[in-house]
């Protein structure tokens, strides 16, 4: 019998299991895969032997991500500044300026008016209340419709749409304007804060922090997929794929939201919550690391290509670099190397593409999706409730974070809440 069973070994599960263990609780962590870390996934590059790369979450900002900063300090995990952008090759229209902020002076007044509207709408969001509790349905519309209402000139319109595509992992007709505004609110109500959070990276990969946290958890079982959680009796029974069952007083579900529909909950979860879980969120974000020859250090490209953003990741050799591109898996097939080359050459016709590296999070049955991005109309219907306890079952992870959804910080935030709830129950 355990005091708590934690299902899932990403950062939320690791923090929950570690903190409960350090509070004197007997804890079992069950992870379905062969590794810990979840969507924070550092491994050797498939193209550059000996080079460690981040296939999943990679960036942090100490001001915006204080819990993650505290974990790094706790274990002495080194970080480095993210690649500084010093050269710009945008495709935003003939009047765009090739610099970090490419908006021409002729569009400044329109950008000022649109910025006012964006910040006004973002300030309607109280991060603690949940999007379903604030009468925000009028903002939960397709992003392209919202941007149309901003009446932006061509360059600033495309600049906004490109970065939104990068951050949300959805084309504008499928993305929710409310979710874009939620990200602005999460970054201290700063539009630039969303982009400037790409500030630091793990010097040696996120696995350093994963390994350090896991050392404080005595009992971890890998390749143990949970199929059922039954709290109808005096204790909570957790059943795994091979039929074995474990018992605990409390359970923390720390797996991605899109996998919860594969778990049989007894009794069933509340209907309103269950409907969104069955649908799954609509995130399709695709991060591709591209090995190239002939690219400048510090290059940044933003534009109307199938890669809305393409920028420097790291040096490989004097003439070779890794670039990172963002798009979505519904719009682009990363297995089509010809399409990858065309997408890169659209911005950088002088470079040679040598190889690509990525992880298909949607096809991976342990994730069934990348970082969270709701379908239009989902989170104004059910949002905060997704992360609320259901009896003795607690739900954590960056997918259900109110403060920092989609970030490691959000995973740590939700774990903190669940641990406090269990310790004070």
From Swiss-Prot:
Homodimer. Inhibited by (R)-6-hydroxynicotine. Inhibited by high concentrations of phenanthroline. Activity is strongly affected by Hg(2+) and p-chloromercuriphenylsulfonate, but not by N-ethylmaleimide and 5,5'-dithiobis-(2-nitrobenzoate). Fairly stable between pH 6 and 9. FAD binds at residues 12, 31, 38-39, 56-59, 226, 398, 406-408. It is found in: Cytoplasm. Its EC number is 1.5.3.5. GO terms for molecular function: (S)-6-hydroxynicotine oxidase activity; nucleotide binding. SUPFAM superfamilies: FAD/NAD(P)-binding domain. This is (S)-6-hydroxynicotine oxidase. Keywords: Alkaloid metabolism, Cytoplasm, FAD, Flavoprotein, Nucleotide-binding, Oxidoreductase, Plasmid. Changing residue 311 to F: 4-fold decrease in kcat/Km and kred for (S)-6-hydroxynicotine, with larger effects on the kcat/Km value for (S)-6-hydroxynornicotine. (S)-6-hydroxynicotine binds at residues 166, 311, 326, 371, 407. It is an enzyme of class 1 (oxidoreductase). Pathway: Alkaloid degradation; nicotine degradation; 6-hydroxypseudooxynicotine from nicotine (S-isomer route): step 2/2. Belongs to the flavin monoamine oxidase family. Changing residue 407 to F: No change in kcat with (S)-6-hydroxynicotine as substrate. It comes from Paenarthrobacter nicotinovorans (Arthrobacter nicotinovorans). Involved in the degradation of L-nicotine. Catalyzes the oxidation of (S)-6-hydroxynicotine (6-hydroxy-L-nicotine) to 6-hydroxypseudooxynicotine. Oxidation of the pyrrolidine ring of (S)-6-hydroxynicotine leads to the formation of the optically inactive 6-hydroxy-N-methylmyosmine, which hydrolyzes spontaneously to 6-hydroxypseudooxynicotine. Acts with absolute stereospecificity on the L-form of 6-hydroxynicotine. Can also use (S)-6-hydroxynornicotine. Its cofactor is FAD. InterPro entries: Amino_oxidase (IPR002937), FAD/NAD-bd_sf (IPR036188), Flavin_amine_oxidase (IPR001613), Flavin_MAO (IPR050703). It catalyses: (S)-6-hydroxynicotine + O2 + H2O = 6-hydroxypseudooxynicotine + H2O2; (S)-6-hydroxynicotine + O2 = 6-hydroxy-N-methylmyosmine + H2O2. One of its GO terms (biological process) is alkaloid metabolic process. The gene is 6-hlno. Binds 1 FAD per subunit. PANTHER family: AMINE OXIDASE, AMINE OXIDASE [FLAVIN-CONTAINING] B. Disulfide bonds: none annotated.
């Amino acid at each position: 019998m355990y005091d708590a069973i934690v299902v899932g070994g990403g950062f939320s599960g690791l923090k929950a299991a570690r903190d409960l263990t350090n509070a004197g609780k007997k804890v079992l962590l069950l992870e379905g895969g062969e590794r810990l870390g979840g969507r924070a996934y550092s491994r050797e590059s498939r193209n550059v032997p000996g080079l460690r790369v981040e296939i999943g979450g990679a960036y942090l900002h100490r001001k915006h991500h204080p819990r993650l900063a505290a974990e790094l300090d706790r274990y002495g995990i080194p970080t480095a500044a993210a690649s500084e952008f010093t050269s710009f090759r945008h495709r935003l229209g003939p009047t765009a300026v090739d610099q970090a902020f490419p908006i021409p002076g002729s569009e400044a007044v329109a950008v000022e008016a649109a910025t006012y509207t964006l910040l006004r709408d973002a300030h309607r969001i109280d991060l603690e209340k949940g999007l379903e509790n604030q009468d925000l349905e009028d903002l939960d519309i397709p992003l392209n419709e919202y941007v149309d209402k901003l009446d932006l000139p061509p360059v600033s319109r495309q600049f906004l749409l490109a970065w939104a595509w990068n951050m949300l992992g959805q084309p504008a007709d499928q993305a929710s304007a409310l979710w874009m505004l939620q990200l602005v609110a999460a970054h201290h109500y700063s539009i630039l804060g969303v982009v400037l959070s790409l500030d630091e990276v793990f010097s040696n990969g996120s696995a350093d922090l994963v390994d350090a946290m896991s050392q404080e958890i005595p009992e971890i079982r890998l390749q143990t997929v949970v199929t059922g959680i039954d709290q109808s009796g005096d204790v909570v029974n957790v059943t795994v794929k091979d039929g074995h069952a474990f018992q605990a007083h409390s359970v923390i579900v720390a797996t991605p939201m899109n996998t919860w529909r594969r778990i049989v909950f007894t009794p069933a979860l509340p209907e309103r919550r269950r409907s969104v879980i069955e649908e799954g969120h609509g995130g399709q974000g695709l991060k591709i690391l591209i090995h190239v020859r002939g690219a400048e250090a510090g290059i940044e490209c933003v534009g109307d290509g199938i890669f809305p953003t393409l920028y420097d990741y790291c040096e490989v050799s004097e003439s070779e670099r890794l670039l990172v591109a963002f798009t979505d898996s519904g719009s682009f097939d990363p297995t089509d190397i010809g399409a990858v080359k065309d997408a890169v050459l659209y911005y950088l016709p002088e470079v040679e593409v040598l190889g690509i590296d990525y992880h298909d999070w949607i096809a991976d049955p342990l994730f069934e999706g990348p970082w969270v991005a709701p379908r239009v109309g989902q989170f104004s219907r059910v949002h905060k409730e997704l992360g609320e306890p259901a009896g003795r079952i607690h739900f954590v992870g960056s997918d259900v974070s109110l403060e920092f959804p989609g970030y490691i910080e959000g995973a740590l935030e939700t774990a903190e809440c669940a641990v406090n709830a269990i310790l004070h129950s």
